[in-house]
């Protein structure tokens, strides 16, 4: 039962990050969430347009 809730929590977190990335568009380079002793960081690696 607990693993079911953990799976749902991970899916919701992934969808939230994906949605935020789509909304921010090209202006997003790094996204960091810090809560208590947990840090989640998403970094986009890309080559700038010339």
UniProtKB/Swiss-Prot annotation:
It is found in: Cell inner membrane. It comes from the Bacteria. It is a single-pass membrane protein. InterPro entries: Hok/gef_toxin, Hok/gef_toxin_CS. Pfam families: HOK_GEF. This is Putative protein HokF. The gene is hokF. The chain crosses the membrane at residues 5-25. It comes from Shigella flexneri. Keywords: Cell inner membrane, Cell membrane, Membrane, Toxin-antitoxin system, Transmembrane, Transmembrane helix. Belongs to the Hok/Gef family. One of its GO terms (cellular component) is plasma membrane. Toxic component of a type I toxin-antitoxin (TA) system. When overexpressed kills cells within minutes; causes collapse of the transmembrane potential and arrest of respiration. Its toxic effect is probably neutralized by an antisense antitoxin Sok RNA.
């Amino acid at each position: 039962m607990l693993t079911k809730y953990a799976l749902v929590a991970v899916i919701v977190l992934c969808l939230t990050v994906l949605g935020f990335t789509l909304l921010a568009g090209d202006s997003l380079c790094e996204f960091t969430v810090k809560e208590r002793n947990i840090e989640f960081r998403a970094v986009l690696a890309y080559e700038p347009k010339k």
